[in-house]
Each structure stands twice: as structure tokens, then as C-alpha cells.
């Protein structure tokens, strides 16, 4: 989860796609986006056994209705306090892991912004 959907798209295009292209093993697992039924888009990378879904903390739609065992929240200090009147995006993302109980993993990282107020 990036701070915005636009940042998620940029991260996908500038980091994730080149990573897949440069790794023979990943290239073999992730079907190219140009393949019609690949399941590979800018914000979703499907591979055997799972998928990588990217979204923004500014999108309530992107933070609901999808169980996730692993959630990586990046630059959380840039997240809005409330998203679309549905609450804290950090809490919304964490709710996606409820299905997995003690097997869930949340990775929360950020560049600190304001001393004493950073998440």
C-alpha cells in the first residue's frame, strides 16, 4: 500500500516491472501484461500460488474486500488520517489480514516526518 494510487502505479512501473524483467525466475512466473489473460496489470501481478496487488492509501475501494496474508504498508506518514469517510487506511489494510489470524504479517515502514507524531 503506497500513499496514493498514483504512487502505487509509479512504483509498479519503475520498480516492480523492471525487477520482473531482469530476473529470469520471476519472468518465468509472472506472465507478461501483453498476454490477454495474464492477470498482470499495472496494479496486479499474478503468479502461481498468489498475486501482488498494489493500491493507494487514498482509495477505500483498494483497501477492502480482499483477504491478504501479507500486507506491506510503505511511507505510512504520508497516508491520510481518513480515506473516503471509511476510517484510517492503516486500520483498513490491517483488517484485510483478519482471515489469517496469527499467520498474518504486516510490514509497516516510513520515512519519519514530524518528531513525536510519526506513525
Describe these PLM feature segments.
Residues 1-119:
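Phosphate/NTP-binding elements of NTP-utilizing enzymes
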